[in-house]
Swiss-Prot record:
PANTHER family: ATP-DEPENDENT DNA HELICASE HOMOLOG RECG, CHLOROPLASTIC (PTHR47964:SF1). It is an enzyme of class 5 (isomerase). InterPro entries: ATP-dep_DNA_helicase_RecG (IPR004609), DEAD/DEAH_box_helicase_dom (IPR011545), Helicase_ATP-bd (IPR014001), Helicase_C-like (IPR001650), NA-bd_OB-fold (IPR012340), P-loop_NTPase (IPR027417), RecG/Mfd (IPR047112), RecG_dom3_C (IPR045562). It comes from Treponema pallidum (strain Nichols). Residues 285-453 form the Helicase ATP-binding domain. Residues 47-141 are annotated as: Wedge domain. Keywords: ATP-binding, DNA damage, DNA recombination, DNA repair, DNA-binding, Helicase, Hydrolase, Isomerase, Nucleotide-binding. This is ATP-dependent DNA helicase RecG. Plays a critical role in recombination and DNA repair. Helps process Holliday junction intermediates to mature products by catalyzing branch migration. Has replication fork regression activity, unwinds stalled or blocked replication forks to make a HJ that can be resolved. Has a DNA unwinding activity characteristic of a DNA helicase with 3'-5' polarity.
Length: 686
């Protein structure tokens, strides 16, 4: 049977009283299957002996010693034993025996022992309070697993319980992976995995066991992803190789529909190679019977929205409706304004719907939607509220998709089914201005076809990034003033809205007053999330028109703000912002044909992680490189849509790491999809 099918309670093991059962419950261990698959977090190599001279802070030592003295420190009940020991080279160390004074009797002066532990240096001597000590004749040289614990539970007890479970049940365990997969990819059976993880003979055993477990976790997820895609679309997602082949499509102009050609002729610039390719990929998807599910990734300012509008026209020309969902009213308004500028002149009927649309206008808009008089509606979460109904919603475009939960996205998709005459699932395009690392793209977003826009519109110059201490603020302000004198505009970004007075963190409101006085000749405005949507829209309108020269803001301007004349952004307390946020904020400039500048101002004290973030920002402007580095710094659980994906079946990895184990992920994906293709072919043959 499979390990997860072993449902006997862990209480059948000897030595599991009420206290131990409660401890195991805190570790989510309630069955034999649970305890067998409770994997170690590391393994201690106790097969080799070292000398104290080989000590480093990063490693534990196993040393054969002789006890040379017993010392005591503290008074009364807190009196504690200190064992003084010496290795074969005469190097001395001290063992602080907190709550282990009984070692005084077990290891008298002159006795020999083997000590295993981590040491630190104090006053020229090595000391340890975290150690194991065994008599010479009792020592077993082996690889010991070390498990995550909970309060009161000891390693020795947990090891004993796991070994007892292994002795009784290991013979009943079958492998989750099919035998041909095990053989083709040289993987261990599940029984051998259990032996390699819990009772390894060598560290090589551990490596083989971990590799097989990692492959199994990735394979299981990719099978789920593949089956979901087959159910929804009748085909598997594109593999990396197939995506690369698609990227060879050189041109799109000849394949444009009538409305798309009209929009293309109106553009004052040429589409980039990547935009053309992605438009073709989407157009081909829209001509298929099964619903499209595609993620468009692009760096800041790469032109994803324009690609989405070209996609809209294909659907509208076929008589369908399109809904474009944005996470904030500010971003939704930006999209609506862009659509009005580009699509209204070629006859597209547009609407804008948010929670703030007044009742009279809202009633008319809802009637027009259900009557099919509106081709494209742009809005926020109001698009999937109960009162909104569609005539024939065939395409849903979700911008900044990571800001929406799976349930919210599903609600809008359900609206499409309800509003479709045949009850079909609408096509889905998700857009992300935060590049998603390839590692997460294959794991978390593996059931989507992925299009990548890397090439940037022509004529743009790379943003020059400066990293400076806060003491250089005056020079930075002076530089920005010179740029504004030339007719440019600037952003000043701060981590707080209000000055709370407990720290030296600058705030938007405080710096707005300061900068208004410093740049007295120019118009200075502020914007933050506590302002009403109407206030934010008014300020952004003034800034876009050039009436406001300097915008003091929080990260509310992180996405969706496109002002080509703004060429300076000053981010103060940059060490307080995440890598992704810094990259998005930097993307507010560099959108015109003039040289742009980003100033990352930091305080005197920074964590190592903050220093690393700023160093990365100074070394590259490639959003995909930054996304990979961000994933390394924060881990896969904190990046992208991982938590949202959990709602639809993703439960995370226990051993695998998509960053560290990316090569295994690629192989497991190919293996899973190959198996699904064979199964699909067999079922069709029948």
């Amino acid at each position: 049977m499979l390990i997860g099918e072993i449902k006997e309670p862990v209480s059948v093991l000897k030595g599991t009283g009420k206290v131990v059962l409660a401890q195991l419950e805190r570790l989510n261990i309630s069955t034999i299957g649970d305890i067998l698959s409770y994997w170690p977090r590391l393994w201690e190599d106790r097969t080799q002996e070292q000398m104290f001279s080989q000590w480093t802070l990063a490693h534990r030592l196993q040393v054969r010693v002789s006890v040379t003295a017993h010392c005591w420190f503290g008074f009364g009940k807190s009196k504690t034993l200190k064992l003084v020991v010496q290795d074969g080279q005469g190097c001395v160390a001290e063992l602080l025996c907190f709550r282990r004074n009984f070692l005084h009797f077990m290891f008298p002066v002159g006795s020999e022992a083997v000590v295993y532990g981590s040491f630190y240096e104090k006053d020229g001597l090595l000391e340890s309070s975290s150690f194991d000590i065994e008599k010479i004749d009792c020592i077993e040289k082996k690889i010991l697993p070390v498990y995550p614990l909970t309060k009161g539970l000891k390693q020795m007890k947990l090891r004993m319980l796991i070994c007892a479970a292994m002795d009784q049940w290991i013979g009943t365990v079958d492998s989750e992976l099919p035998k041909p997969i095990l053989e083709k990819y040289h993987l261990l059976t599940k029984r051998d995995v259990l032996l390699s993880m819990h009772t390894p003979r060598t560290l090589d055993d551990v490596a083989k066991g971990k590799h097989s477990l990692i492959f199994e976790e990735f394979f299981s997820l990719q099978m789920t992803i593949g089956m979901r895609s087959l159910q929804k679309r009748g085909r598997l997602p594109l593999t990396q190789g197939e995506s690369d082949q698609q990227s060879a499509i050189p041109s799109v102009v000849s394949e444009l529909s009538l409305l798309q050609k009209k929009l293309h002729r109106c553009l004052p610039f040429e589409l980039t190679v990547d935009q053309k390719r992605v438009i073709t990929e989407i157009t081909q998807d829209l001509e298929r019977e099964e619903p499209m599910a595609r993620l468009i990734q692009g760096d800041v300012g790469s032109g994803k929205t324009l690609v989405a509008f070209f996609s809209c026209l294909k659907i509208i020309e076929q008589g369908g409706q399109v809904a474009l969902l944005a996470p904030t009213e500010l971003l939704a308004r930006q999209h609506a304004d862009t659509a009005a500028r580009l699509l209204a002149p070629i006859g597209i009927r547009l609407a804008f719907l948010t929670g703030n649309v007044k009742s009279e206008g809202r009633a008319y808009l809802l009637e027009a939607l259900v009557a099919g008089e509106i081709n494209l509606v742009v809005g926020t979460h109001a698009l999937f509220s109960k009162s909104v109904r569609y005539h024939d919603l065939r395409l849903v475009i979700i911008d900044e998709q990571h800001r929406f939960g799976v349930l919210q996205r599903s609600a809008l998709i359900q609206k499409g089914r309800e509003g479709n005459p045949q009850g079909k699932t609408p096509h889905i395009i998700m857009m992300s201005a935060t590049p998603i690392p390839r590692t997460l793209a294959l794991s978390v977003f593996g059931d989507l076809d992925i299009s990548i826009i890397k090439s940037m519109p022509g004529g743009r110059k790379p943003v020059i990034t400066y990293i400076a201490r806060k003491t250089k603020a005056e020079k930075v302000y002076e530089f920005v003033g010179n740029e504004i004198e030339k007719g440019r505009q600037a952003y000043f970004i701060y981590p707080r809205i209000h000055d709370i007075g407990l720290t030296d963190l600058k705030s938007v409101q405080c710096m707005y007053m300061y900068l208004k006085n410093y740049f007295a000749r120019y118009a200075v405005a502020m914007i933050h999330s506590k302002m009403t949507e109407e206030e934010q829209q008014r300020i952004m309108k003034y800034f876009s028109e050039g009436t406001v020269h300097i915008l003091v803001a929080t990260s509310v301007v992180e996405v969706g703000v496109d002002v080509p004349n703004a060429n300076c952004i000053v981010i103060e307390h940059a060490e307080r912002f995440g890598l992704s946020a810094l990259h998005q904020l930097r993307g507010r400039v560099g959108r015109g044909d003039v040289q742009s500048y980003c100033f990352l101002m930091h305080g005197d004290e920074m964590t190592e992680c903050a220093k690393r973030r700023l160093k990365i920002m100074g070394s590259t402007a490639d959003g995909f490189v930054i996304a990979e580095e961000d994933l390394k710094l924060r881990g896969p659980g904190d990046v992208g849509d991982t938590k949202n994906f959990e709602q639809s079946g993703y439960s995370g990895f226990r051993v695998a790491d998509p960053v560290r184990d990316y090569p295994i992920l690629q192989v497991a994906r190919e293996a899973a999809f190959e198996l699904l293709r064979k199964e699909k072919g067999s079922s069709e043959a029948r």
